[in-house]
């Protein structure tokens, strides 16, 4: 697509950020392996979304958290250049989600407003209740994120893993009752839900729709496989 003067229209950046729980409980029942498989599988879908959208340049970042938040992919990276390095869960690691959200908010502060970027898309995956061994509560971290312009306008989706996932906190992170909150109870569900959430978030962020639910459509059915993670906790 080009403008009237014959110059190509520049793609606007769409920052796509995964916030991933790598706490000790992710070692149970093959959860961390399933999470790695899910991210590996979702990347080709995101590349397809990027190729199909002439208006957005999809830039990926990944933030992992356990006892502390650490960037796995810190620099905004075009999706076709992302090569996934498998995550390792932290044995006996806590779930410092509040600290992770503060780290995320700090990164969003650095976005260049001159580019008129699309709202960021943020997908949070966690299997536990937020801890605060760093002294930062979930509520404090979330408020820091929402006080940030980009954090407040971001398309925020969340996915719980297993029965111990704190769905109340994940719902607060989403902030919109019309946006589906999903819980995966086995590896198959985790892959399918992350693929759905990633495709939905990238579409909504780059093609804003006014109205309840942000126009992202219905999630996949939850009757996939046996609920092994709800049995394990």
Question: Where are these predicted regions, by residue range?
Answer:
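Acidic, low-complexity intrinsically disordered regions
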Residues: 1-233
């Amino acid at each position: 697509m080009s403008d009237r003067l014959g110059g190509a229209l520049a793609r606007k950046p769409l920052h796509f950020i995964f916030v991933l729980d790598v706490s000790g409980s992710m070692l149970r029942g093959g959860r961390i392996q399933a999470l790695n498989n899910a991210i590996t599988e979702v990347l080709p879908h995101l590349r397809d979304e990027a190729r199909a959208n002439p208006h957005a340049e999809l830039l990926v970042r990944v933030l992992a958290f356990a006892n502390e938040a650490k960037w796995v992919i810190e620099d905004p990276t075009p999706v076709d250049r992302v090569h996934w390095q498998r995550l390792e869960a932290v044995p006996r690691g806590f779930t410092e989600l509040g600290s992770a959200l503060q780290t995320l908010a700090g990164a969003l502060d650095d976005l260049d407003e001159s580019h008129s970027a699309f709202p960021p898309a943020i997908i949070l995956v966690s299997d536990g209740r937020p801890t605060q061994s760093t002294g930062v509560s979930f509520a404090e971290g979330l408020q820091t994120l929402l006080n940030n312009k980009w954090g407040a306008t971001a398309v925020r989706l969340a996915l719980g893993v297993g029965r111990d996932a704190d769905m109340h906190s994940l719902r607060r992170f989403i902030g919109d009752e019309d946006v589906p909150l999903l819980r995966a109870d086995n590896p198959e569900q985790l892959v399918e839900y992350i693929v759905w959430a990633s495709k939905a978030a990238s579409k909504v962020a780059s093609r804003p729709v006014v109205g309840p639910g942000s126009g992202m459509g219905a999630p996949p059915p939850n009757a996939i496989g046996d609920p092994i993670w709800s049995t394990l906790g």
